[in-house]
UniProtKB/Swiss-Prot annotation:
Record organism: Corynebacterium glutamicum (strain ATCC 13032 / DSM 20300 / JCM 1318 / BCRC 11384 / CCUG 27702 / LMG 3730 / NBRC 12168 / NCIMB 10025 / NRRL B-2784 / 534)
Cross-referenced Gene3D superfamilies: Ribosomal protein L9, C-terminal domain (3.10.430.100), Ribosomal protein L9, N-terminal domain (3.40.5.10)
Highest taxon listed in the record's lineage: Bacteria
PANTHER family in the record: 50S RIBOSOMAL PROTEIN L9 (PTHR21368)
Any single biological process term in GO: translation
Gene coding for it: rplI
PROSITE patterns according to UniProt: RIBOSOMAL_L9 (PS00651)
Source organism phylogeny: Bacteria, Bacillati, Actinomycetota, Actinomycetes, Mycobacteriales
Stated name of the protein: Large ribosomal subunit protein bL9
Family: Belongs to the bacterial ribosomal protein bL9 family.
Record-level Gene Ontology MF annotations: rRNA binding; structural constituent of ribosome
Amino acid sequence: MKLILTAAVENLGVAGDIVEVKNGYGRNLLLPRGLAIVATPGAEKQIEGIKRAQEAREIRDLDHAREVKVALEALEGVTIAVRTSESGKLFGSVKTDDIVDAVKAAGGPNLDKRAIVLPKNLVKTTGKYQVEAKLTDGIVSRVKFEVVAA
């Protein structure tokens, strides 16, 4: 089944890509969730126009992403206050929403929570941590924060 992606799909492509997938994957996952549309000649022409406009937008986005990267790496004093046990273990864990809110509260730029990449071993104790923020393709910034007991 030939589809045009309307959003980025992991291990498949980004918005605007024309992909060939198995019928069941397309009908049962991609189409119902709005991640793709059926590739027709008219839709392919429309996507070409959208891609040209998107390329012009990406140039502006790269400049903005570089500015955000500089702002994030210069940011100091990002703290997240959470409830902990006496031994310093968190009740739960720090999530991407918490990091985005803490960066915003510290005077940093607005981030999309999907841009934050948490480590496999989640943040479950107090201390200093560092995570990556994927701003665009090829531009990754490090966000440093400290988890403290509330």
